[in-house]
Design a protein with these regions (language model features):
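Short C-terminal tail/terminal secondary-structure segment
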Residues: 209, 220-234
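Short, small/polar-rich loop/turn modules that mediate ligand/substrate recognition or access, typified
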Residues: 150, 155, 219-221
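Canonical Rossmann dinucleotide-binding motif of NAD(H)/NADP(H)-dependent dehydrogenases/reductases
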Residues: 1-11
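Active-site helix of classical SDR
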Residues: 98, 134, 142
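Substrate-binding pocket helix/loop in short-chain dehydrogenase/reductase
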Residues: 74-75, 82-87, 189
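Residue(s) in the substrate-gating loop at a strand-loop-helix junction
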Residues: 118
């Protein structure tokens, strides 16, 4: 919504049809500026079908890779199928999107790519083997792409959110992590998060707008932490 408020034209994609319908209703006032498309970034054909909806666009100014799935696992419980699904979605999917949009990004005067990481790209936690590995890989993909694409003036940066109120904030039992007593004790009462609260999507939106805009035209290969200071206390 913050990007649309900047008068941008947006292709908004999600693998979840229900989520797309909710977004379409929420963003109805921007109906002339946003196109919705179902997508599975593990599938090249699905990506092509989504991008066909904007084939009339002469160029693309920005790409935000925000797709991710979470799998609770560790070295004893993970299997290859679950591992591959997380890596393919959270890491390889971003590579596919970048490769598919590069031709039109090159035509932009100020092209930018943002990859959404996590604090877990930097700090390992229990039972998050595949997710943390994928996010760590996405960090290096961001830096490597910044080097590779600099010659085309394409900037590539990342945002690393902490505990943000999204669909992924709910546990398998349906409990919101911000409401868990363990979260309140460790992260709020004991100051693990210096700002003493969980974050919201609105807390993140300004960083996305900034990295897509000309205000960050000499910034590439960098990561902005949006975590209330959590990364300072690890």
């Amino acid at each position: 919504e913050s990007i649309l408020n900047e008068k941008a034209n947006v292709l908004l994609c999600d693998v979840d049809r229900v989520a797309l319908k909710i977004a379409e209703k929420k963003l109805s006032k921007f109906s002339e500026n946003v196109i919705f498309s179902e997508i599975d970034i593990r599938s090249e054909n699905s990506i092509n079908q989504a991008l066909d909806k904007v084939k009339s666009w002469n160029h693309i100014d920005g790409l935000v890779n925000n797709a991710a799935i979470l799998d609770i696992n560790n070295v004893d419980t993970i299997n290859e199928e679950r591992w591959n699904k997380v890596i393919d979605t959270n890491l390889t999917g971003a590579l596919r999107m970048i490769q598919k949009t590069i031709p039109k990004l090159k035509k932009s005067e100020h092209p930018a790519i943002i990859n959404t990481l996590s604090t877990q790209a930097f700090f390992a936690v229990n039972d998050s083997l595949a997710y943390s590995t994928a996010k760590g890989g996405l960090l290096m993909l961001t830096r490597s792409m910044a080097v590779d694409l600099g010659k085309h003036n394409i900037r590539v940066n990342a945002i690393a959110p902490g505990f943000i109120d999204t669909r992924m904030a709910y546990t398998e039992s349906g409990e919101h992590e911000h409401e868990m007593e363990s979260f309140k004790d460790i992260y709020i009462k004991n100051g693990k998060i210096p700002l003493k609260r969980g974050g919201s999507p609105e807390d993140c939106s300004g960083s996305f707008v900034f990295l897509l805009s000309n205000m960050s035209q000499y910034i590439t290969g960098q990561t902005i932490f949006v975590d209330g200071g959590l990364s300072c206390t690890y």
